Amino acid sequence: GFGSLLGKALKIGTNLL
């Protein structure tokens, strides 16, 4: 669902940091 997409985006964001 949408929560899954949000979690993915957060994971990618923290990866970039």
Swiss-Prot record:
The highest taxon in the source lineage is Eukaryota
**The keyword Kinase is annotated on this UniProt entry:** no
User: Keywords assigned by UniProt?
Assistant: Amidation, Amphibian defense peptide, Secreted
What GO cellular component term, any one, is given? extracellular region
Q: In which tissues is it expressed?
A: Expressed by the skin glands.
BP-aspect Gene Ontology terms = defense response
Q: Which first-to-last residue range defines the signal peptide?
A: none
Leucine amide carried by residues: L17
What compartments host this protein?
Secreted
What family, per the record? Belongs to the gastrin/cholecystokinin family.
Q: What is this protein called?
A: Caerulein precursor fragment-related peptide R2
Instruction: Say which species the protein is native to.
Output: Xenopus ruwenzoriensis (Uganda clawed frog)
Classification lineage: Eukaryota, Metazoa, Chordata, Craniata, Vertebrata
